[in-house]
From Swiss-Prot:
Function: Serine/threonine protein kinase required for cell-type-specific transcription and signal transduction in yeast. It is thought that it phosphorylates the STE7 protein kinase which itself, phosphorylates the FUS3 and or KSS1 kinases.
GO molecular function list: ATP binding; MAP kinase kinase kinase activity; protein serine kinase activity
CDD domains the record matches: SAM_Ste11_fungal
InterPro entries reported in the protein's UniProt record: Kinase-like_dom_sf, Prot_kinase_dom, Protein_kinase_ATP_BS, Ras-bd_By2, SAM, SAM/pointed_sf, Ser/Thr_kinase_AS
SUBUNIT field: Homodimer. Interacts (via SAM domain) with STE50 (via SAM domain).
Enzyme class: transferase
Family: Belongs to the protein kinase superfamily. STE Ser/Thr protein kinase family. MAP kinase kinase kinase subfamily.
Protein kinase domain: residues covered: 415-712
Name of this chain's protein: Serine/threonine-protein kinase STE11
Domain SAM residues, every copy: 20-84
Domain of life of the source: Eukaryota
Location of Phosphoserine modifications: 323, 465
């Protein structure tokens, strides 16, 4: 029974458990000294709290309350009941949200009704029904979608342009309702995979699955809201006894759940990151003006046209298929045009089509007659400013001061500078595009303050090799390890940054592997040193952990396998990376691992191996191996220890030794303390980490040996 403390100290019964209505109005009037109006209130049947709290001036005048002072006292007291009710409702809502925000991972697993099994995801269909799908062993979006498509009822399958049912994964989309922004969010592949394999993402029990030509129906949205409210209801029953796991749900109101939803589309004039990750090339190709805001439109159009023609010529000459993962703008435009042609060809009369085309194959643009390709090129010609435009060398100028590094891959002679996609102490990283081929790139750019600093070429490379080795050894002694490094001047810092970039160039141009970021070349231009690297859509392991939290173990094994394959390739080339960590492991939107940042990497010579020379204290402290901290040896086994630390990162969402400072971590590692192995890892996972954290580097397994570990065996259903 609820009570309200009066000014005189008397408690009034205002709850629903009142046994008599008259005492309430009587006590109400006695409290404010207006009992002379009691008979009037009773005659008008204004005797309960619900009736009294809606009193106003006109009603009081009709009741005969003519004194202004009495009316004010009655109105103030009656309005306080409404205020108390609102405060009570707000307090209840606050208590609910506090319970939600205080939940931990353990509390989520308590509610088996929401996610019955560990590896299960609930997909909502457009008829309002829901399907539970086991995604264990599915490491990409295609495999997840295929499992669901096999179980779809016939009436919910997508149809192609001919009205035929299709089960191709590219014909289906996945949405999720974002109640913090009150929008429908279309998931990209990397988002779908991450949500499905995350333990703490409550969205995994209400993903909406529709065909590409549809948007989520009212029935699907209604089912999603019911599951969402059921989730909140279940979470509210758990006491505030654990950590702040679901703080992102704070601030969600009832109005958000009931308001009108909009689809979260990208705006044409706004550069968008996908969950704080680099956007895919397909998206950039549809918004070039947005991603290259300071580039002349004529130059952009010319590049698009030349890239398209270049891709079309290569397709015909080499009969090469169009790669779905290409970062080349011409390939993307060609693929889009090809899709349109396929749709048009399928719409032709079948009898007419059979007399001209092989009915067993749908011809692709790459295999069409030359005149067909010319026709499409002419269509793209409409994008150009003038069909009689000057040649590339005239357009970009003949007196360019770019000096290119000779590499196995042609260095871009002309390139378009796009939006900034990252920055650091060395400078900035920009989105770039080869002006001739249309290839998208990530361009590391650092200002060269000293005019004597130049890009090394093959002409002076051999002559300066001994000097460079000596400089490298001097640089190793004062390399950055957090608080350990104390450079004397800003000029020394800048010089070291440039040296690190030049060192990175020399190593990268020898590397050509799927799991290593591709190096396109370097140039010195306008006082800047540019390094042209492969553009990797997506983000690093570190950024994904920050956005999504720890990974599922099946996803960790998939990424670890690829990291070790890349590390094994480096070691075969006698290169030690020396800075393997989550921030230097990129994951593209297809789930492919790319190792990057070779600024402090080292190429071992046979002399290095024989002498087993004293190691320098280089790298990132929390990922350092004991022999590096003790400076006892320089071996490839340091990368194995660091890879184990990355596995710890993916398991926990934090670096090893998260409770220690850098100096404390150096002391711990130096006294043979290994990182704590997650207790929730499988027995094989724990065994893998124990081998990676072998204190004696001579007994620590190599990358090739670890690749044969049972933990990395793929168990794909």
């Amino acid at each position: 029974m609820e009570q309200t403390q009066t000014a005189e100290g008397t408690d009034l019964l205002i709850g629903d458990e009142k046994t008599n209505d008259l005492p309430f109005v009587q006590l109400f009037l006695e409290e404010i000294g207006c009992t002379q109006y009691l008979d009037s209130f009773i005659q008008c049947n204004l005797v309960t709290e619900e009736e009294i709290k809606y009193l106003d001036k006109d009603i009081l005048i009709a009741l005969g309350v003519n004194k202004i002072g009495d009316r004010l006292k009655i109105l103030r007291k009656s309005k306080s009941f409404q205020r108390d009710k609102r405060i009570e409702q707000v307090n209840r809502l606050k208590n609910l949200m506090e319970k939600v925000s205080s939940l931990s991972t353990a509390t989520l697993s308590m509610n088996s009704e929401l996610i019955p099994e560990k590896h299960c995801v609930i997909f909502i269909l457009n008829d309002g029904s829901a399907k539970k799908v086991n995604v264990n062993g599915c490491f990409n979006a295609d495999s997840i979608k295929k499992r669901l498509i096999r179980r779809l009822p016939h009436e919910l399958l997508a149809t192609n342009s001919n009205g035929e049912v299709t089960k191709m994964v590219q014909d289906y989309d996945v949405f999720v309702l974002d109640y913090t922004k009150n929008v429908l969010h279309l998931l990209y592949d990397v988002e779908l995979v991450t949500i499905c394999h995350a333990n703490d993402r409550v969205e995994k029990n209400r993903l909406i699955f529709v065909s590409k030509d549809q948007t989520p129906s009212d029935k699907a949205i209604s089912t999603s809201k019911k599951l969402y409210l059921r989730t909140l209801s279940a979470l509210s029953q758990v006491g505030p006894s654990s950590s702040n796991l679901l703080a992102q749900n704070k601030g969600i109101s009832h109005n958000n759940a009931e308001g009108k939803l909009r689809i979260d589309n990208t705006e044409k004039d706004r550069i968008r990151q996908i969950f704080n990750q680099r956007p895919p090339s397909e998206f950039i190709s549809t918004n070039l003006a947005g991603y290259f805001p300071h580039t002349d439109m004529k130059r952009l159009q010319k590049t698009m046209r030349e890239s398209f023609r270049h891709s079309a010529r290569l397709s015909i000459a080499q009969r090469r298929p169009l790669s779905a993962e290409s970062n080349n703008i011409g390939d993307i435009l060609l693929k889009h045009s090809n899709a349109v042609d396929m749709a048009l060809l399928q719409g032709l009369d079948q009898t007419r089509l059979s007399s001209k085309l092989d009915t067993t194959k749908i011809p692709k643009l790459a295999h069409k007659r030359p005149e067909d390709n010319d026709a499409i090129s002419n269509q793209l010609e409409l994008l150009s400013v003038d069909s009689g435009e000057e040649e590339d060398h005239d357009f970009f100028g003949e007196d360019s001061d770019i000096v290119s590094l000779p590499t196995k891959i042609a260095t871009p002679k002309n390139w378009l500078k796009g939006a900034c996609i990252g920055s650091g102490s060395f400078g900035s990283v920009y989105l770039g595009m080869n002006a001739h081929t249309g290839e998208l790139m990530a361009v590391k750019q650092v200002e060269i303050k000293n005019n004597n600093i130049g890009v090394p070429t093959d002409n002076n490379k051999q002559a300066n090799s001994d000097e460079n080795n000596e400089q490298e050894e001097q640089q190793e002694k004062i390399e950055d390890v957090g608080a350990v490094s104390h450079p004397k001047t800003n000029q020394n810092i800048h010089r070291k940054m440039v040296d690190a970039l030049q060192h990175e160039m020399n190593l990268l141009k020898e590397l050509h592997h799927e799991n290593i970021v591709t190096y396109y070349g370097a140039s010195q231009e306008g006082g800047n040193l540019n390094i042209f690297l492969e553009y990797v859509p997506g983000g690093s392991v570190s950024s994904m952990l920050n956005n999504y939290g720890p990974f599922e173990e099946s996803l960790i094994t998939n990424f670890t396998r690829q990291i070790l394959i890349g590390v094994a390739y480096l070691h075969k080339k006698n290169i030690i990376h020396r800075d393997i960590k989550g921030a230097n492991i990129l994951i593209d939107i297809k789930g492919c691992v790319k190792i990057t940042d070779f600024g402090i990497s080292k190429k071992l010579s046979p002399l290095n191996k024989k002498q087993n020379k004293r190691a320098s204290l280089q790298g990132s402290v929390f990922w350092m191996s004991p022999e590096v901290v003790k400076q006892t040896a320089t071996t490839a086994k340091a990368d194995i220890w660091s890879t184990g630390c990355v596995v710890i990162e993916m398991f926990t969402g934090k670096h090893p030794f998260p409770d220690f400072s850098q100096m404390q971590a150096i002391f711990k590692i130096g006294t043979n303390t290994t990182p704590e192995i997650p207790s929730w890892a499988t027995s094989e996972g724990k065994n893998f980490l124990r081998k990676a954290f072998e204190l004696d580097y001579q007994y620590r397994p190599s990358a090739l040996e670890l690749l044969q570990h049972p933990w990395l065996d793929a168990h794909i259903i």
